[in-house]
Regions:
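Structural signature of extracellular appendage/secretion-system components
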Residues: 1-580
């Protein structure tokens, strides 16, 4: 992409590679959702099997207790019960205790009773529906009739990987491992899209586009402008000759300046060369005059910035990557800004510990006319605030810092009906509390950029150019080097710290591979311990083949000796008869 004869092909390969990367991330997200659906089906099957085994063990308990009371042999029923318990222990970790009457009681490792003299069954409202869902119901323990018909709840539940066994592993996958991977994939996409768009918005195509049409920001014209630094808005001819320009120093504007004030300043500065408008949360600038185009450039000495990104990138005027569900930049909202949500709109927030167990949840209910700071206060005063602190960082992102004892705790937002001033942007997308709201699901490289390499903005505006002089050059590909440099630079990923795209992706995929390897090792270790326990049990209470073989040899020798004695006695008897 540096001006060689093959630069168009190189640009085409680059844009195609970016789209392929986005497609791969989207496919991974789809695969994760599919896996969660498969795991959910297995959860349902496992619950049904556990219930069947508990019922079987309960029936055999009665048989063994009755036979014990009558002094009868219990071997057959006890062996069947042991087989059922062994199968149950593979599905869930249990503690089994023998009782004086011959029965056994069964508890989970956390002490929840599954079986004593009264049968209990697991109640799972979801029934193992084979679809990925934002949240899943708890598995409740209920008293049950001998027939298996469920009654009242015991008040105990199975809700995390701590239950152990196959069921615990499934819950860990469904509620922790897979959602965490998906959330981190969203963070990776956020960093990638912000880096790519930072470079594309700093450049321009030659000829420049007749209009720059921004994406949805979630803002309205009366919102605080919030920019520092300066930017240049210009109009050029198709060959890059400057027609008009205006430099806006945001720092010199009043402290209470609004987005509408910026639009007014742009229009006044360009003197009819172009028309800017801000409608329904989107900024657009359209050149006036046939063949003219629009350029927005950063001031090199004092670049414009809100939430750490320039004015063109913030409004998405020249993005390379777009998403219909996210603005792809931090909001830049401050505590005193209006949150823009209406009474009756809500967002459900769930907090889970490092094992995936839901600790608590809260439904955020903003009041009309409130501020972003009010949202922070409401969350800190909620049950969620008992487990950590909410705050707003300098880029307008909501942050949650769990208490030290809850390291690894995560938040999720299963449902969100909020809508900031009717723009279609809600609490989740505006404040970026989790990476799951990154907009990855419908992101893409702009179709016109994919279709035509010349639509990728690689040229840089000559800030000191005067009207009538060349401000853009057709052979200028400085943006190509900028893409390389930006993708290799350190990025601010919010709660996930500052790192490079390469390092973050390597850690993410490496962590997934490591967890898979550890899970396999744990499986092998558990299988070895199980086999050892079974062998020791069988040696103690079952048939030891070596010992029995030795006994048979002794018996055979005894039989042979007895046979010889009998044979000798027979011969003596015959001799006596002959003597008579």
């Amino acid at each position: 992409m540096t001006g060689s004869q093959s630069s168009a092909q190189t640009v085409a390969v680059f844009t195609s590679d970016v789209q392929d990367a986005i497609d791969s991330m989207q496919q991974l997200q789809t695969d994760v959702d599919g896996l969660r659906g498969d795991v959910e089906s297995e959860v349902g099957y496992s619950v049904d099997k556990i219930n069947s085994l508990l019922k079987r063990i309960h029936e055999l308990n009665g048989t063994v207790a009755s036979a014990t009371g009558l002094g009868k042999n219990i071997g057959g029923a006890a062996d069947q019960r042991m087989s059922a318990i062994e199968e149950l222990s593979g599905l869930i970790s249990v503690n089994v205790r023998d009782q004086p009457d011959g029965r056994v009681t069964i508890e989970t490792v956390n002490g929840a009773v599954l079986l004593d003299k009264k049968l209990r069954q697991l109640s799972y409202a979801n029934g193992g529906a084979s679809a990925s869902q934002p949240t899943y119901p708890n598995i409740d323990i209920r008293f049950a009739e001998d027939s298996g018909a469920m009654g009242a709840a015991t008040g105990e539940k199975l809700d995390s990987a701590a239950v152990g066994g196959k069921l615990g592993g499934l819950l860990d996958l469904r509620d922790r491992a897979l959602p965490a991977f998906s959330e981190q994939m969203g963070v990776l996409f956020s960093g990638l899209s912000e880096a790519l768009n930072a470079v594309s918005n700093a450049g321009s195509t030659v000829p420049p586009p007749a209009s720059l049409d921004g994406r949805q920001t979630g803002l309205v014209g009366s919102d605080r402008l919030g920019f520092t630094g300066a930017a240049t808005f210009a109009v050029t001819k198709a060959d890059g000759t400057l027609v008009a320009k205006t430099s806006i120093d945001f720092g010199a504007m009043p402290a209470n300046a609004t987005i509408d004030d910026m639009v007014t300043a742009i229009n006044a500065g360009l003197g009819g060369g172009a028309t800017a408008s801000f409608t329904d949360g989107k900024l657009s600038i359209k050149a006036n005059g046939a063949g003219n185009g629009v350029v927005v450039a950063q001031n090199e000495a004092n670049p414009s910035a809100r939430a750490g990104v320039g004015v063109s990138q913030y409004f998405g005027l020249n993005d390379m990557v777009r998403s219909d569900s996210n603005s792809l930049v931090p909001s830049g909202l401050a505590a005193g800004d209006a949150h823009g949500f209406a009474t009756g709109e809500t967002a459900q927030i769930v907090l889970r510990d490092a094992t995936g167990r839901a600790l608590t949840s809260y439904t955020l209910s903003p009041a009309t006319g409130g501020t972003v700071g009010d949202l922070v206060s409401e969350l800190n005063a909620s049950p969620l605030g008992d487990f950590g602190d909410f705050s707003l960082d300098d880029r307008g992102r909501m942050r949650f810092e769990p208490t030290g004892a809850l390291s690894g705790a995560t938040l999720s937002i299963p449902s969100d009906s909020t809508d900031r001033f009717g723009t279609g942007r809600g609490f989740t997308a505006m404040l970026g509390l989790t990476g799951a709201s990154s907009g990855l699901e419908n992101a893409q490289v702009r179709p016109e950029v994919l279709a035509s390499p010349g639509k990728l903005p690689l040229a840089r505006f000559q800030e000191n150019a005067v009207v009538g002089a060349k401000a853009l050059g057709a052979g200028d590909t400085r943006g190509a080097t900028a893409f390389v440099d930006k993708l290799a630079s350190t990025l601010d990923l919010g709660k996930d710290g500052k790192t490079t795209i390469e390092r973050f992706s390597s850690l993410l995929l490496g962590r997934a591979g490591l967890e898979a390897s550890q899970a396999n090792d744990n499986l092998l270790d558990a299988a070895a311990r199980r086999d050892d326990a079974v062998n020791r049990r069988d040696s103690f209470s079952g048939v030891n083949i070596d010992e029995e073989l030795a006994q048979m040899v002794i018996l055979q020798n005894s039989y042979s000796a007895a046979a010889r004695v009998i044979s000798t006695a027979s011969e003596m008897y015959d001799t006596l008869l002959n003597m008579v």
